[in-house]
Amino acid sequence: MGSHYKIDLENEREEFIKVYSILKNDVFDELPKMKLASNAIDYIKELLNSPTITGGKMYRGLGFLYSLNTLLIAKNNFDNNNNNNNNKNSETSQHEARIIGWCLEFLSFFLITDDIMDNGLTRRGELCWYRHPSPFNPTEHKVGMLAINDSVLIESFLFFILKKYFKNKSYYVDLFELFHESIFYTATGQLLDSSSFHLKRGDFTNFTFENYSQICINKSSHHVFYLQIKIAILLTDIMDNNEKQKDDTTCKEEKDKEKEQEEELIKNICFNLGIYGQAQDDYFDCFGDPKVIGKTGTDIQENKCSWLICKANTICNNDQLNQLKKNYGNDNENDVSIVKSIFKEINIPKHYENFENEQYNSILKEIQKLSIISLPKSEILLFLLKKLFKRSK
């Protein structure tokens, strides 16, 4: 990147959005070469202009830019303090970094199929894409199950953009593989998350925090938190500005051990951030205002292994648990109302508040451990943690 400065996320958001117009045009310019019918091209244009991609908080893309800039500032400071004229990182420009940020945002293609599996109504304040009027025939048809193919299209656009801008970069294969790995983990997480819908109603043996953690780690932790940091590290080859310069006699085994310890800490922190963030989403699904969170909750109807039901499974008395087993996972308003009333009866909101504070403090301690090894990387994770803490949507 040409210049390194503390990023202003509000200003950066404006610049970031401008880059999306360029990437859309890259895709649009490619479509005529495929000799597609004009209505198919119009369909894809409407898809790429939908809130599915651009209507969110852009947490992944902007978070990545913050991570990358933080590491680059630290590397520059280290190089300047040690008269090191290493220009290796100039290989990636600010514009290219924003493109990678948008590739991270393209991972929202998972939301399309997630909404179908969850029978969702709204997403990001709009109708879910599969419920959206069909661009082919908006007066008579919804997008419907064609949305499954649309999610594959968006995934393909991600790799089209990666190839267009980064195929000649030394890190292209690594970047490509990181995205594929993250998609693999997320798809596995989606499988785990949706599997409870197929379980027998009233069977709560699956509703444990052990199972819940595995869902969160695979479904959320990898692509929301871990991937952006891994890519930022890949692009910087950082030498932390808080560590003393090591001489040539430092043994390779010691360096490898330190790197392994750092990697393990980062991974565990990201995993716990994913659990924390998913628990927040679960709480909003039940108790949030759809106008604020931008979607209508369906976890109770879909028999989801959510934080709320896992907690209830551990604290309910027999009568309350029997009522939950009778009503949880049913798609009618009366049963949903009974479940919510029991959640309130056992004071789930208070238990959630305690969990949020405990999770914040626990992750903060892990970040403090990381700061001893790598101050810049700990700053990134602290930034992500503060973005989550007490969020309202």
UniProtKB/Swiss-Prot annotation:
<feature type="binding site">
    <location>
        <position position="114"/>
    </location>
    <ligand>
        <name>Mg(2+) 1</name>
    </ligand>
</feature>
<dbReference type="Pfam" id="PF00348">
    <property type="entry name" value="polyprenyl_synt"/>
</dbReference>
<dbReference type="InterPro" id="IPR008949">
    <property type="entry name" value="Isoprenoid_synthase_dom_sf"/>
</dbReference>
<protein>
    <recommendedName>
        <fullName>Probable farnesyl diphosphate synthase DDB_G0268742</fullName>
        <ecNumber>2.5.1.10</ecNumber>
        <ecNumber>2.5.1.1</ecNumber>
    </recommendedName>
</protein>
<feature type="binding site">
    <location>
        <position position="124"/>
    </location>
    <ligand>
        <name>isopentenyl diphosphate</name>
    </ligand>
</feature>
<feature type="binding site">
    <location>
        <position position="220"/>
    </location>
    <ligand>
        <name>dimethylallyl diphosphate</name>
    </ligand>
</feature>
<feature type="binding site">
    <location>
        <position position="57"/>
    </location>
    <ligand>
        <name>isopentenyl diphosphate</name>
    </ligand>
</feature>
<keyword id="KW-0444">Lipid biosynthesis</keyword>
<dbReference type="GO" id="GO:0033384">
    <property type="term" value="P:geranyl diphosphate biosynthetic process"/>
</dbReference>
<dbReference type="GO" id="GO:0004161">
    <property type="term" value="F:dimethylallyltranstransferase activity"/>
</dbReference>
<keyword id="KW-0443">Lipid metabolism</keyword>
<feature type="binding site">
    <location>
        <position position="118"/>
    </location>
    <ligand>
        <name>Mg(2+) 1</name>
    </ligand>
</feature>
<comment type="pathway">
    <text>Isoprenoid biosynthesis; farnesyl diphosphate biosynthesis; farnesyl diphosphate from geranyl diphosphate and isopentenyl diphosphate: step 1/1.</text>
</comment>
<feature type="binding site">
    <location>
        <position position="114"/>
    </location>
    <ligand>
        <name>Mg(2+) 2</name>
    </ligand>
</feature>
<dbReference type="GO" id="GO:0005737">
    <property type="term" value="C:cytoplasm"/>
</dbReference>
<keyword id="KW-0963">Cytoplasm</keyword>
<keyword id="KW-0808">Transferase</keyword>
<dbReference type="InterPro" id="IPR000092">
    <property type="entry name" value="Polyprenyl_synt"/>
</dbReference>
<dbReference type="InterPro" id="IPR039702">
    <property type="entry name" value="FPS1-like"/>
</dbReference>
<comment type="pathway">
    <text>Isoprenoid biosynthesis; geranyl diphosphate biosynthesis; geranyl diphosphate from dimethylallyl diphosphate and isopentenyl diphosphate: step 1/1.</text>
</comment>
<keyword id="KW-0479">Metal-binding</keyword>
<keyword id="KW-0752">Steroid biosynthesis</keyword>
<feature type="binding site">
    <location>
        <position position="118"/>
    </location>
    <ligand>
        <name>Mg(2+) 2</name>
    </ligand>
</feature>
<dbReference type="GO" id="GO:0004337">
    <property type="term" value="F:(2E,6E)-farnesyl diphosphate synthase activity"/>
</dbReference>
<dbReference type="GO" id="GO:0046872">
    <property type="term" value="F:metal ion binding"/>
</dbReference>
<keyword id="KW-0153">Cholesterol metabolism</keyword>
<feature type="binding site">
    <location>
        <position position="123"/>
    </location>
    <ligand>
        <name>dimethylallyl diphosphate</name>
    </ligand>
</feature>
<dbReference type="InterPro" id="IPR033749">
    <property type="entry name" value="Polyprenyl_synt_CS"/>
</dbReference>
<keyword id="KW-0756">Sterol biosynthesis</keyword>
<dbReference type="GO" id="GO:0006695">
    <property type="term" value="P:cholesterol biosynthetic process"/>
</dbReference>
<comment type="similarity">
    <text>Belongs to the FPP/GGPP synthase family.</text>
</comment>
<dbReference type="GO" id="GO:0045337">
    <property type="term" value="P:farnesyl diphosphate biosynthetic process"/>
</dbReference>
<keyword id="KW-0414">Isoprene biosynthesis</keyword>
<feature type="binding site">
    <location>
        <position position="278"/>
    </location>
    <ligand>
        <name>dimethylallyl diphosphate</name>
    </ligand>
</feature>
<feature type="binding site">
    <location>
        <position position="219"/>
    </location>
    <ligand>
        <name>dimethylallyl diphosphate</name>
    </ligand>
</feature>
<keyword id="KW-0460">Magnesium</keyword>
<keyword id="KW-0152">Cholesterol biosynthesis</keyword>
<feature type="binding site">
    <location>
        <position position="304"/>
    </location>
    <ligand>
        <name>dimethylallyl diphosphate</name>
    </ligand>
</feature>
<comment type="function">
    <text>Key enzyme in isoprenoid biosynthesis which catalyzes the formation of farnesyl diphosphate (FPP), a sterol precursor.</text>
</comment>
<feature type="binding site">
    <location>
        <position position="60"/>
    </location>
    <ligand>
        <name>isopentenyl diphosphate</name>
    </ligand>
</feature>
<keyword id="KW-1207">Sterol metabolism</keyword>
<feature type="binding site">
    <location>
        <position position="295"/>
    </location>
    <ligand>
        <name>dimethylallyl diphosphate</name>
    </ligand>
</feature>
